[in-house]
A protein has these predicted regions:
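Structured adenosyl-cofactor binding patch, chiefly the S-adenosyl-L-methionine
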Residues: 194-257
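C-terminal, charge/polar-rich interaction regions
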Residues: 251-329
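Beta-strand cores of modular interaction/reader domains in eukaryotic scaffold and signaling proteins
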Residues: 91-93, 129, 158-159, 177, ...
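S-adenosyl-L-methionine/SAH cofactor-binding core of RNA-modifying enzymes
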Residues: 117-187
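A structural/positional concept
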Residues: 64-139
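Extreme N-terminal leader/targeting regions
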Residues: 1-89, 97-99, 329
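Short coil/turn segments at secondary-structure boundaries
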Residues: 104-105, 171-172, 187-192, 314-315
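Structural alpha-beta junctions
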Residues: 111-129, 145-147, 198-208, 289-297, ...
């Protein structure tokens, strides 16, 4: 469940069927999530009274409500502390920022800002932790991941690392660590493992897992905000890993994986001594369900690779010819 779901359950348990607030910012997003986030952060408490903007618990505007979430003394987050503690921390380890160029650092900061926006859709600001780098965001900041782990003492910690041996299947953890790494120059491959080695050397127990799409990391979005959203869709929304990846995946990332799949599934034929590679039109239908592509992407990638898209009947004939040739040899 997302924070707003927990908040609605809590309000219902108090026989509160609507909520209002005085902040105009509530109109910019999901109003219940906005109020829930400020309640969880301790900025709002719930009191008797009428705010400027009123909503039912589905987030629909109503004329008035006798309860207001605002800067007052009333029902506080302390009453749902146990439920709030069940939400995971997303920790971005920026200890390797010294390896980044100025351009990469700017990209890292942008990704962190977008990550906060993602966290706000599912949880609240203090569930995002930035370690090893100061930012202008309202996330929690620590000098190091080690400082955070010593203070919060999470029981289960998972480091998301594309080079890990174990696969992430949606395991629940108290803390997910993501490497604050932007690699535009190609000189940081495998550096997330340095974070794992450092934490283990410093006496911390953690698991190391990779997110894969049908057995391969290719096609899995690698931006920090995208990884965060995939994880939260899985662990809070209960979404399957492949579906979460598909929801977050953009077409550029999808085309990278598509090229791999075309290379694996195309066939080599010879026509009058000239070699060609072909692939059936129906292959598009095989991948469109888990790669966010359209037909234009399919034909474009095949063309760039020198692969000819043919009717499936022709591909079947070519396959039979190849089998016959193999048998004759």
């Amino acid at each position: 469940m997302r924070l707003k779901d927990v908040f609605v359950e809590f309000l219902n348990s108090k026989n509160i069927r609507c909520i209002s607030t005085n902040s105009k910012k509530v109109l910019r997003e999901d109003p219940i999530q906005f109020i829930a986030r400020n309640f969880a952060s301790g900025k709002f408490e719930i009191c008797r009274g009428e705010g400027r903007f009123s909503f039912n618990l589905k987030g629909e505007r109503i004329e008035r409500c006798e309860y207001v979430a605002w800067k007052c003394e009333g029902i506080s987050r302390d009453e749902i502390e146990n439920e709030l503690d069940k939400f995971p921390y997303i920790v971005v380890d920026c200890s390797l920022k010294h390896l980044h160029s100025d351009k990469e650092l700017k990209s890292l900061i942008r990704q962190i800002e977008k990550t906060l926006s993602v966290v706000r859709k599912y949880m609240w600001d203090e569930r995002l932790v930035i370690a090893g780098m100061k930012t202008m965001t309202s996330a929690l900041h620590y000098e190091s991941v080690e400082d955070f782990l010593r203070e919060k003492k999470p029981e289960r910690v998972i480091l998301l690392d594309p080079n890990a041996g174990e696969i992430f299947h949606g395991e629940r953890a108290d803390c997910y660590i993501i490497g604050g790494i932007v690699d535009k120059t190609g000189n940081k491959k495998g550096t997330t493992s340095l974070i794992y080695e450092r934490l283990v050397d410093n006496g911390f127990e953690l698991e190391r897992r990779k997110i894969v799409l049908r057995g391969d990391i290719l096609g899995v979005p690698d931006r920090i905000n995208h990884i965060t959203e995939i994880v939260l869709k899985i662990v809070l929304d209960g979404m399957e890993v492949e579906k979460a990846i598909y929801d977050v995946q953009n077409r550029k990332i999808a085309r990278w994986r598509l090229r791999r799949e075309i290379a694996k599934n195309s066939r080599r034929i010879e026509v009058k001594g000239r070699p060609f590679r072909i692939i059936g039109k129906s292959f598009y239908e095989e991948v469109v369900g888990w790669l966010k592509i359209n037909k234009k992407d399919f034909y474009r990638c095949a063309s760039e690779m020198g692969v000819i898209v043919v009717d499936d009947e022709l591909q079947s004939v070519a396959k039979e010819a190849l089998l016959f040739k193999a048998e004759m040899n």
